[in-house]
Amino acid sequence: MPEGGVLTGPEIQRCIREGRISVTPFDEKYINPGSLDLTLGDTVALYRDTAVVSAGGFDLPFRTGTMDLTEEALRATTRQGGKNLTPYYAEMDSKKQHDVWKFDIDPKIGWLLRPGIGYLMHTAERVCTKEFVPVIDGKSSIGRLFVMVHVTAGYGDTGFDGQYTLEVLTTYPVRVYPGMRFCQMRFHTSVGDRLNYRAYGNYVDDASMGPVPSKSWKQFGT
């Protein structure tokens, strides 16, 4: 295989069969000519300081001082698939750890993406390769709804093992559903010695599952 190339769809499928790429769950119908489709997972996370939820006639920020959302508001948000969320602009500090609320997405209701809110979502598939460089990006069908699937950091690390967190923004209100084809992954061959992700990764955890919030605060030692 030439160095520095991008795997074709048939080569991705061959590498999965040979165990050089691990995708769980895997469906052959998601193989494209030059990429692999990945589907949307069933959990969404929002920073507590960036949205307002309406429940019982009241609008409550995810956090107001030390007051968290009531169970009623949490249940209402899940029941309505995020329809009761509106933007709430508070300062995000990259030196600080920010808490998130996580909601399960009902596959029948889906989740309504709203402009002005940043959503942490994730792939349903767990992906790992110790040989190739994975690159994740949106699908054109999702992009034409003016939904941005991955704001930045599209390159994955060789050796990473887990579901991929997606940084989702939308221009218009758009409802999305778990299990739908949401993004795609390409696999690049690498040139030179490979570094062990578990030894050199900046934010190494055990297998990453579900949406993971920013860990930028760790670089400041706080």
Where do the PLM segments sit?
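DUTPase catalytic domain/fold
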Residues: 1-222
